[in-house]
C-alpha cells in the first residue's frame, strides 16, 4: 500500500517538473489587434466586445502553449495566426485549454510523415499534423500553409484550424470524427449517419465539401469544420442540417459570430 502511494507521489512530482511552465500573460495591445484585424477575417467580423474577449483568449493560449519556429525566424504574425486558429473553434466556450498540446512547431515548408522537410526529404506533402507517439503533445504546421489559410478566405481550406479541430476530437482520447466532449450523447447516432451520408455525396462528386473529407470520418469532421468557419453563409445554404449540427457542436454560429447560448 505504502509502496503504491510512494510511486504515485513520485509520479506526480515528475509530472510537475516536466509540465511546461505557463508564461506570463502578454497584454493584448495595439500590435496584436492590428495583426488580427489585418489577417483574420473571423476576428474582423466580431463586435468590439467580442474582439477584446478573442484577444484575451489568444494571449492566454500563447501563455499556455509554446510556439517554436524550426529553422526559421518566428514572426509575431505566425504566433498570432497559430493562436487565432486555436481560439476560433473553441470561441463558443467560456474557457478552454487544450489537454493534448504543449507546443506548436512551425516548419518553413511542407514535410513528410517522418517530420522531415527540405530538399532532401521525400514525400513532403504534409501541411499540418497532430503528433503522436514520441511527438505526443506537439502540433506541426507548415508556415506557408498557416499563412495561406488566412490569406484565402474563400477556398474553405485552413490547415491550422483543421489540425486544432483534430485536437478537439482527441479530447475524448481518440481522433475518430466523433467529438464526444463537444456533442451530447443523443446526437451521436444522427451525427454518424450524417457523416456517412455526406461522405457518400463527396465520393460521388455530389458535394462542394473538399474531397479529402470523404477519406474517413476523422477527416470529414476536420474538413467540414474548415468550411463551417471560413464560409458559414455558403455552408448553411448548401448543408443546412449539417450546419445546425455544427452550431450545436461548437456552441457558436460564425455567420453571426456571437456565442450561441
What is the predicted function of each stretch?
Residues 1-25:
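N-terminal signal-anchor transmembrane alpha helix of single-pass membrane proteins
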Residues 17-128, 242-245, 249-252, 259:
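A metal-dependent hydrolase signature that marks the N-terminal structural subdomain at the beginning
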Residues 42, 46, 70, 74, ...:
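Conserved aromatic-histidine-acidic binding/catalytic patches
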Residues 47, 155-171, 222:
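Active-site recognition of the HExxH zinc-binding catalytic motif
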Residues 50, 54, 153-157, 218:
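Hydrophobic (often cysteine-bearing) scaffold residues that line and stabilize catalytic clefts
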Residues 81-97, 109-151, 174-261:
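Metalloprotease/metallohydrolase-associated module, dominated by Zn2+-dependent proteases
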Residues 102-103, 137-139, 157:
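Generic beta-strand structural signal
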Amino acid at each position: 500500500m505504502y509502496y503504491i502511494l510512494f510511486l504515485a507521489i513520485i509520479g506526480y512530482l515528475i509530472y510537475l517538473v516536466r509540465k511546461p511552465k505557463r508564461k506570463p500573460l502578454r497584454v493584448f495591445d495595439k500590435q496584436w489587434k492590428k495583426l488580427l484585424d489585418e489577417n483574420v477575417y473571423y476576428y474582423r467580423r466580431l463586435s468590439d466586445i467580442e474582439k477584446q474577449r478573442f484577444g484575451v483568449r489568444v494571449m492566454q493560449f500563447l501563455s499556455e502553449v509554446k510556439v517554436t519556429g524550426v529553422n526559421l525566424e518566428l514572426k509575431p504574425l505566425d504566433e498570432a495566426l497559430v493562436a487565432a486558429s486555436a481560439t476560433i473553434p473553441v470561441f463558443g466556450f467560456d474557457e478552454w485549454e487544450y489537454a493534448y498540446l504543449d507546443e506548436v512547431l512551425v516548419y518553413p515548408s511542407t514535410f513528410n510523415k517522418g517530420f522531415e522537410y527540405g530538399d532532401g526529404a521525400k514525400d513532403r506533402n504534409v501541411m499540418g499534423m497532430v503528433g503522436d507517439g514520441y511527438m505526443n503533445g506537439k502540433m506541426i504546421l507548415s508556415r506557408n500553409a498557416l499563412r495561406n489559410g488566412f490569406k484565402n478566405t474563400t477556398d474553405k481550406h485552413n490547415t491550422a484550424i483543421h489540425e486544432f479541430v483534430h485536437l478537439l476530437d482527441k479530447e475524448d482520447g481518440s481522433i475518430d470524427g466523433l467529438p464526444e466532449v463537444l456533442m451530447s450523447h443523443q446526437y451521436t447516432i444522427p451525427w454518424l449517419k450524417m457523416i456517412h451520408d455526406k461522405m457518400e455525396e463527396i465520393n460521388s462528386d455530389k458535394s462542394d465539401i473538399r474531397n479529402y473529407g470523404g477519406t474517413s470520418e476523422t477527416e470529414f469532421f476536420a474538413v467540414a469544420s474548415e468550411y463551417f468557419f471560413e464560409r458559414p453563409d455558403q455552408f448553411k445554404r448548401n448543408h443546412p442540417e449539417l450546419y445546425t449540427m455544427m452550431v450545436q457542436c461548437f456552441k457558436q454560429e460564425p455567420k453571426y459570430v456571437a456565442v450561441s447560448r
